[in-house]
Amino acid sequence: MCPSMTAAEETFHLDTSRKDLTGYLYFIWHTYFADTPRVNEVHIAYSYPWKSRLGLIRLSLDNTLTFIGINTLLQHPHVPDYVLLTTIAHELVHYKHGFGSPLPRRYKHPHANGVVDHELEAHQLGDPIRLCNEWIDQYWYAFYDRFHLWRPINGFAQNKQS
């Protein structure tokens, strides 16, 4: 269904298990967003298998907790690592811009004028964002239709749909 990775794509493979989203988050934060202070507690977990959303970020009412939800399908082995990397980095851009975080809000709208992609480029994530966008454009909807009922069970990926 999906092509094998090229050498350029393999560059973005992380040494962290997809099950350890906290490890992914802190690796990405340390490596690409060291200029962004963590001003509250940040939790990350897999969420619903949305068809048209890869992630979300929310701030608690008392501003003490940020939650980043990641589409559960991104832990599937057919999804390239750069899609997960880019999704988490995308949510960190929102955090940095004051959406889903107590930091001052920098813009009126979170995606105005392509600000997220510009920020990802500025943080040396231009190649992964391009690869991610290409993969999403070419494979996401067919992948979703085939695997949206898929759930990892007891740490092992199983496809409920043949």
For the regions a protein language model found, what residue spans apply to each?
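Metalloprotease/metallohydrolase-associated module, dominated by Zn2+-dependent proteases
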Residues: C2-R58, F99-S162
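Generic secondary-structure microfeatures
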Residues: Y46-W50, T72-L74, E91
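Short pre-active-site segment immediately N-terminal to the catalytic Zn-binding motif
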Residues: I68-T86, S101, K108-H109
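Active-site recognition of the HExxH zinc-binding catalytic motif
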Residues: T86-G98
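Active-site beta-strand-loop-beta-strand hairpin of nuclease catalytic cores
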Residues: L61-T66
